[in-house]
Regions:
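Class I SAM-dependent methyltransferase SAM/SAH-binding core
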Residues: 46-97
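A short glycine-rich, Lys/Arg-flanked "PGG" loop and its adjoining helix->strand segment in the class I
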Residues: 121-136
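Conserved alpha-helix/loop element of class I SAM-dependent methyltransferases that forms part
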Residues: 24-41
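Short alpha-helix
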Residues: 162-178
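A short acidic, Gly/Pro-enriched loop at the edge of an enzyme's catalytic core
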Residues: 96-108
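Conserved Class I S-adenosyl-L-methionine
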Residues: 183-241
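Short, glycine-/aromatic-enriched active-site segment of Class I SAM-dependent methyltransferases
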Residues: 139-161
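N-terminal, positively charged/glycine-rich alpha-helical extensions of SAM-dependent methyltransferases
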Residues: 1-15
């Protein structure tokens, strides 16, 4: 996917308002959209499931390196993060088994990863624990069209226990965990839909230019049509401890 869309270390679908030119811009815009929910960018911030480190690196526009933490379950991705964001605290750690002390962070950001966690509830409970009073959690996430979808890709998705039926159920989960001032926006038409159309267009352009063959075209189209069918709302959320 990165090859087709020209990503530069990002691993997210992006935010695509009118005028967005490419995937890299969309990925940056999604992070910026989330950071707008943190008006005072001070103190310590944690980048959960930081991927290859592009999002962590961009946090350095707002925070000194010593105040930026990043975690990922993949040692390889943490090595990349350490290269892209030198001076930050990049650690191999499971998002549902975080070992930080209580009330350690002022802010937490998590971009398109919570649907991988076993489970969201455990992650939210731990995030609530390690946030300072008044601290904020901001994240983007996707819900799936049915609980059974979680069984289709067991290597990527947790059990159906992680399934949430609706945006209202998503909001309620935050409140049950103890978060307040919960805001959940449904932005599928500005996140997934334009990304999907961009990807399909690029695939056909590469095929027409003979850069890929018919088999690769059909395999990738099948994958993306399946992703479109299995995903439901794409959400952006902000909550305060």
């Amino acid at each position: 996917m990165a090859h087709f869309l020209g990503e530069e270390g990002f691993r997210n679908i992006g935010y695509w308002p009118p005028g967005t030119l490419d995937q890299n811009q969309a990925s940056e815009q999604l992070q910026d959209y989330l950071l707008n929910y943190i008006p005072e960018k001070k103190g310590r911030i944690l980048d959960v499931a930081c991927g290859l480190g592009a999002t962590t690196r961009r946090l350095l526009k707002h925070y000194p390196a010593e105040n930026v933490w990043a975690i990922n379950i993949s040692e390889k991705q943490i090595e990349s993060t350490r290269t892209l964001a030198p001076g930050c605290h990049a650690l191999v750690m499971n998002a549902v088994e975080m070992t930080f002390e209580d009330a350690f962070f002022d802010s937490i950001i998590c971009i398109e990863a919570a649907f991988h966690f076993e489970t969201r509830r455990k992650f939210l409970e731990d995030a609530q624990r390690i946030l300072k009073p008044g601290g904020r959690l901001v994240l983007s996430d996707t819900l799936f069209s049915a609980a059974a979808r979680h069984t289709q890709f067991p290597q990527l998705l947790p059990s159906p226990e992680n399934h949430l039926e609706s945006v209202d159920a998503y909001r309620k989960l935050f409140e049950e965990v103890g978060f307040r001032s919960v805001v959940v926006e449904e932005l599928r038409d500005l996140i997934w839909k334009p990304h999907f159309l961009r990807f399909v267009t690029v695939l056909h352009e590469r095929f027409a230019d003979r850069e890929i063959g018919i088999v690769q075209l059909m395999e990738n189209l099948a994958m993306y049509y399946e992703l479109d069918a299995m995903t439901g709302p794409w959400v952006v959320a902000c909550a305060e401890k």
